Amino acid sequence: MGFPPRCIGQKIPEGLHVRMNLETGVTEAKLISNDKPKNALKMIEDESNNFPEKTSSESENRKTSYKNYEELKKDFNELNLNPKTDAEILRELIEKHVDISKQKDRDEEEILTILEDLEFLVHQYDNANDFVKMDGFKTIVYHNLNATNSEIKRETLKLLGSSMQNNVNVKIHALETGSVDILLRILALDTDMSVKYRALFALSGLLRDFPYAQLKFVENAGLSVFSKLFESDNLKIQQKMLTLINDLLQEEIDSKKDTKQVEKIKQYEDIQLRKRLIVHNYCDHLNKMIVNSVVIEANDHDIIERCLGALYLMVDDCSSKLTDKSKDIVLSLRNLYRKLSQNESVDGDPDYFGTLYDLSNAIVQRIQKIKVEL
């Protein structure tokens, strides 16, 4: 279902929900109400946008065309323009989902519509908290993740991931109710790669900026699950795992910059992510990713940047395990980006290739230094 863009300066009617889509940068609006006539907004729009110029005779008779208060009240009641709060809509959607789920021949298209509406709402912080308080995880999320319909599972995982974005209260609830194990089981066992992809999206929302969840992830064999996925042929999910690992490693580095956050620093140290990655053959996976990023996605500089970034964060640990082919590729990339930085820009950014040159050059220099030290 598409959403109409919000026009600048346009007043948003009551009951219309608006959000910024962080993936596209587009402002989206959606009318979420099961009891409004479908043409209600159109009726309002027609009333407000189609005022003909008044003739003198029309002006003279204007008083006689006015409707009294009772008539106006009746007209508005017919439109049913009594806006509901987000909390009321959330509760109605949850109750409707529960009712449909109990039916023997349940309407799965209706369930998908409900999940879409809920996902739209939980992007807002307070709505996500209300979703938790209304037992939405148990009655909807965990219930649907046992479904056989892959589309329902995908939409449910999207709902789960969206509810946890930058919301520590929801993350805590997800962790305490077993989300880590559930998501890892999906990543390990589900045969639909699109479901795995959404599970990784939800897992990323849970782990970022939440060291205690990261600890539970590694303690529950999360890196073993990742290692198996790195051995698969799905480059898309491997790139997402690489990005998540990069972010978690960077979090640990950043935590040490604030010496006052003693407890937070200790939490990251307890995870021992870097050491655990080495045990789970992460250096070998990086070798493979570096080669594939050039061979398979030679013109996708964003993917290459992720691989270089991952290697930069782990170069001290992985330098001795890099293959000659990987080292040659990094050297070639350095030469390529030196030339491109002198001649081209990307989307008006003249420093894009310069940044990639600096990154690849730093890796080369570090590898050479480690070799000399050995």
Which residue stretches match the model-derived regions?
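Recurring C-terminal helix/loop segment of individual leucine-rich repeat
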Residues: 129, 172, 212-215, 275
